[in-house]
Amino acid sequence: MDNYTYSELLKSLQNKCDNIALIIKPEKIKQELERIEKEQEDPNFWQDVLKARDTNKEKVRLNRLLETYQKTKDSLDESVELFELAQNDNDEVTLSLLYEEAPTLEHSVQKVEIEIMLSGENDASNAIITIQPGAGGTESQDWASILYRMYLRWAERRGFKSEILDYQDGEEAGIKGVAFIIKGENAYGYLKNENGVHRLVRISPFDANAKRHTSFASVQISPELDDDIDIEIDEKDVRYDYYRASGAGGQHVNKTESAVRITHFPTGIVVQCQNDRSQHKNKASALKMLKSKLYELELEKQQNSTKNEEKSEIGWGHQIRSYVLAPYQQVKDARSNIAYSNVEAILDGDIDAILEGVLIAKA
């Protein structure tokens, strides 16, 4: 990096920071935080528990956004000042340090951009994830289990928690399907663009001839809805099936019909849950999954109507990402058009760069 390149980077970052300020309006955020604090001082504040909870969530979000923005702006202003001084004094040591810190500064500005993008209605929610293997038997079932582990590792890296709702072992390896919740701040916001088909190309560990195989798996993401969001489901539109649990979480297999499957006839959506010994709890969890999927489907329809889109991104028809392990190693996302070479780390849950790249590409 040289003086000209760094100078252009600073101009670009300053321009981005100015645009961010126009969007978030820091002074208005401060005023809103003052208003919330006064509201919380009211003795009657906690009488409406749901409203109080939502107000607290908003306070945390605004505080975090303001703090992230201010910290980034201060760092950028300091870098601009140091750069001018170092240029005037021909201070090569300081210039070298500034060049080294440039990627960190760039990432800080990007982090604020991401914060703004995660301010949608459900972005702060937990994420319900369903993974289904495509055609191909063991190959696709193994690929589905690799994706499942990838998301679990991503959650672990962020300090998020996960909970299995339904898990079906594959016949030889992998899984026939899994549904689980990732619980953490902005989990849905980060993962919402994972909806679609994920493609794997590799030398098959199940092929004695060591041939290259292509496998597919479908990932669906929906927000875990708060209890105060009312989604009505007509009983005549659903069928409940009860069966014996099996697989992970179903160690009491063949004892009780505690697992629950719900089929929603108007949409064709099928959800199932077997993570608990209680049929009642499994039914409640399955209903929560169904409501989340119906809510997501309705939002998708509205968005497609607004954008006049002909095709949904959810389902088998839309391939969003390719993971190639042979003859070369590369992960490429179709939305951001960015290719990544750290395939092993990605499959171990290091997917923040991919998720953020897609958020920015779709902004």
Curated annotation (Swiss-Prot):
Report the principal subcellular site: cytoplasm
Q: Kindly state one GO CC term assigned in the UniProt record.
A: cytoplasm
Q: Does the keyword Iron apply?
A: no
Spell out the SMART domains in the cross-references. PCRF
Subcellular location as annotated: Cytoplasm
Q: How is it modified after translation?
A: Methylated by PrmC. Methylation increases the termination efficiency of RF2.
* PROSITE patterns (UniProt xref): RF_PROK_I
Q: Which UniProt keywords are listed?
A: Cytoplasm, Methylation, Protein biosynthesis
State whether keyword Lipid biosynthesis applies: no
User: Could you cite one Gene Ontology molecular function of this protein?
Assistant: translation release factor activity, codon specific
In-chain residues carrying the UniProt-annotated modification N5-methylglutamine: Q251
Q: Which family does it belong to?
A: Belongs to the prokaryotic/mitochondrial release factor family.
* NCBIfam families registered for this protein in UniProt: prfB
Describe the function of this protein: Peptide chain release factor 2 directs the termination of translation in response to the peptide chain termination codons UGA and UAA.
Q: Which named protein is this?
A: Peptide chain release factor 2
